[in-house]
């Protein structure tokens, strides 16, 4: 019950008040992802510090269901300020969690994103939850 309440609070907060849903100028990388089964469309923009190999800023625009929008916002909150290789690692952990294959320790690494763990039991919503993370992982892999 406590996990479900936390899930609802995290999802609602990031959907209703997404901190990272806006446009940014002069992004180093821009990728779009679409989930045709739900109508989700996310355009992710990231800025990198190539010398430090870190993500210094990021934002997303687009439309979609509450899960896709909240999940993208949670991802950006988690990866901004992190080294690029760590962002890839976190994205891979999230995708592992959604497949119900992550350990408790790995889920703990995901901080608030761990609240979405039960999406693995909702097959129709999996594509919604992973869209932003797949785009983020692809963006970071282009910079490594």
What is each stretch, according to the model?
Residues 2, 6, 10, 41, ...:
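Conserved active-site and cofactor/substrate-binding residues in soluble primary-metabolism enzymes
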Residues 3-25:
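Short, conserved "active-site rim" segments that organize catalytic pockets and cofactor/ligand binding
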Residues 17-57, 62:
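Structured beta-strand/loop patches that form or line metal/cofactor-binding pockets in enzymes
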Residues 25, 49-54, 100-108, 141:
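Short, glycine- and charge-enriched coil/turn segments that flank and shape catalytic ligand pockets
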Residues 56, 60-118:
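Active-site- and interface-proximal helix/loop "cap" or "latch" segments in soluble metabolic
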Residues 111-137:
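Glycine-rich and small/hydrophobic secondary-structure elements
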Residues 138-144:
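Conserved small/polar residues in nucleotide/adenosyl-binding loops
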């Amino acid at each position: 019950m406590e996990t479900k309440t936390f899930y609802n609070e995290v999802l609602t907060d990031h959907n209703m008040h997404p901190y990272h849903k806006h446009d940014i100028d002069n992004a180093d990388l821009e990728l779009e992802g679409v989930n045709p089964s739900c109508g989700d469309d996310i355009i992710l923009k990231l800025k990198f510090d190539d010398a430090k190999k870190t993500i210094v800023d990021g934002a997303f625009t687009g439309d979609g269901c509450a899960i896709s929008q909240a999940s993208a916002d949670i991802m950006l909150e988690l990866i901004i300020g992190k080294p690029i290789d760590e962002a890839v690692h976190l994205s891979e952990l999230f995708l592992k969690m959604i497949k119900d294959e992550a350990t408790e320790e790995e889920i703990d690494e995901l901080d608030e994103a761990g609240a979405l763990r039960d999406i693995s039991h909702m097959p129709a919503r999996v594509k919604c939850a992973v869209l932003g993370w797949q785009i983020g992982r692809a963006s970071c892999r282009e910079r490594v």
